[in-house]
A protein has these predicted regions:
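FMN-binding flavodoxin-like domain, especially the glycine-rich phosphate-binding loop
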Residues: 1-46, 56, 68-72, 91-94, ...
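A short, well-structured beta->alpha microelement
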Residues: 70-88
Length: 195
């Protein structure tokens, strides 16, 4: 058996070159060990990107993250928090929350329902979920990134496990977003087995 990159795989020349070398190493190891088991390269890690936004910044970052994860071979889904019922949350494998904070520490309008449901006594255990939160805010406000901090705290309290630590972003969020999304790619790709 020999692993190879399909001709229609969406990689740049440099990525293709690196992957070919990587797969050549795996192929030579398989041949040397005489291992006849089929090799499986995982593809399509399911990821739900839930966004809460008052002005559109968190939504734009969610769509940007969708593209990045798709290019990396994962299976992302972008969801407005208003369209993500609490009853569906325990079935999510990887949950990425991108949310702003509105006013004086309030969740954005479209995140309010999920926020309140997660903080209710009826909130389900979420031990099967891996998650991370990107919190957008303005350090000029006393309750800087409060909504994102609250989501992070509540998901952890309900048993969800962090993929990467929470990242808080001030008005200039491009660099923190980039670092967070790069860490996520690595963390999700390294997950091989369900919880």
């Amino acid at each position: 058996m020999s692993l190879r990159i399909p001709d229609n795989a969406p990689f740049t020349g440099a990525q293709r070159y690196w992957l070919k070398g990587y797969l050549d190493g795996i192929n030579s190891s398989l041949q040397a060990s005489g291992d006849e088991e089929p090799a499986v390269i995982e593809r399509g890690h399911p990821v739900t990107i839930a966004w809460g936004s008052q002005t559109g910044n968190a939504e734009a970052l969610a769509k940007k993250l969708f593209k990045k994860l798709s290019k990396a071979g994962m299976s992302p889904k972008v969801s407005d928090m208003a369209d993500l019922p609490l009853v569906d949350l325990p079935t999510v494998e990887n949950l990425l929350v991108i949310t702003s904070t509105y006013g004086e520490g309030e969740p954005p309008d479209n995140a309010r329902s999920l926020y309140q449901a997660l903080h209710s006594e009826d909130a389900p255990e979420l031990g099967g979920i891996r998650y991370s939160v990107l919190a957008l805010g303005d350090s000029g406000h006393e309750e800087f990134c409060k909504c994102g901090l609250d989501f992070d705290d509540r998901l952890s309290t309900l048993g969800a496990r962090p993929l990467v630590p929470l990242v808080t972003c001030d008005v200039d969020y491009d660099e923190p977003y980039q670092l967070w999304s790069d860490q996520l790619l690595e963390a999700i790709a390294s997950v091989r087995t369900p919880l």
